[in-house]
């Protein structure tokens, strides 16, 4: 029996098949869900507009006044969630409209947000869908290969992926049934980091640093730099900038806390 949050998401997009299409997974996989998997909450929220607090109230409760919410970790989680959503699939027209309203401060990261807003305003969903295909899928392969194993070994499904699966298993984070992408895919790693940074996956304190240092820092910054400079990147150029800057900020922050 589906929980209310999953039912609301299905209604919001017009049915199970449409939600499966938007997520890029098989319809039977979603039909087997009782609730939205933890690692899919951010993506489903982005695609449907249904709040994460509705999708998974057990993970995303409304904070009470006087709570000990860490604003920095919340901001980190939001940045990772944004990157995860944009790397998982091309943004819809509705998401582009919301992105066009982004604002930023005079910091490099803030200016990258402004650049993303401008890029979102200057394109269409159809154009970005083609750009996404050319960059990450392609005929045979895309311009970029957004996988940790590929960046670290030159091949897919190598030892870096196995080590990541071991560490995720220790944290109780399991691969979603029907998801064809390996866990070392850039979007999946960003979604996992969003959940860890926001304390939403039930992992022990410091788990975000462990995953970052072992599985994110060795390659994801290089991927974002490549995306920033990719020949086919127009909308995705500022996405690469945001990712590269976030990787630098994270590495520096974890080093200071060591």
Regions from the PLM with identified roles:
Residues 1-9, 17, 21, 39-46, ...:
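Short, charged recognition helix plus adjacent turn
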Residues 10-11, 35:
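Short amphipathic helical patch at the helix-1/turn junction of helix-turn-helix
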Residues 45-59, 112-123:
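Short, charged early-sequence alpha-helical segments and their helix-coil boundaries
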Residues 67-258:
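Surface/interface-facing alpha-helical segments and adjacent flexible terminal/loop regions used
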Residues 22-37:
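Recognition helix of helix-turn-helix/homeodomain-like DNA-binding domains
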């Amino acid at each position: 029996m589906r929980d209310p949050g999953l039912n609301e998401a299905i209604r919001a997009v017009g049915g199970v098949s449409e939600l499966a299409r938007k997520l890029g997974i098989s319809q039977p996989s979603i039909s087997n869900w009782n609730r939205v998997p933890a690692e899919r909450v951010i993506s489903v929220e982005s695609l449907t507009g249904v709040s994460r607090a509705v999708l998974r109230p057990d993970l995303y409760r409304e904070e009470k006044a006087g709570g000990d919410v860490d604003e920095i970790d919340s901001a980190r989680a939001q940045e990772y969630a944004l990157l995860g959503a944009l790397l998982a699939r091309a943004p819809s027209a509705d998401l582009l409209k919301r992105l066009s309203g982004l604002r930023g401060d005079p910091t490099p990261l803030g200016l990258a947000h402004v650049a993303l807003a401008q890029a979102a305003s200057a394109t269409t969903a159809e154009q970005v869908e083609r750009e996404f295909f050319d960059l990450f899928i392609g005929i045979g392969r895309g311009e970029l290969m957004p996988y940790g194993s590929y960046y670290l070994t030159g091949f897919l499904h190598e030892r870096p992926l196995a080590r990541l699966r071991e560490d995720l298993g220790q944290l109780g984070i399991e691969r979603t049934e029907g998801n064809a992408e390996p866990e070392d895919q850039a979007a999946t790693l960003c979604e996992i980091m969003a959940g860890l940074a926001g304390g939403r996956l039930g992992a022990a304190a410091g788990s975000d640093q462990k995953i970052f240092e072992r599985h994110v820092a060795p390659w994801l910054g290089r991927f974002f730099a490549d995306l920033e400079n990719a020949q086919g990147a127009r909308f995705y150029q500022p996405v690469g900038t945001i990712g590269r800057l976030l990787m630098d900020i994270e590495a520096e922050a974890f080093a200071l806390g060591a």
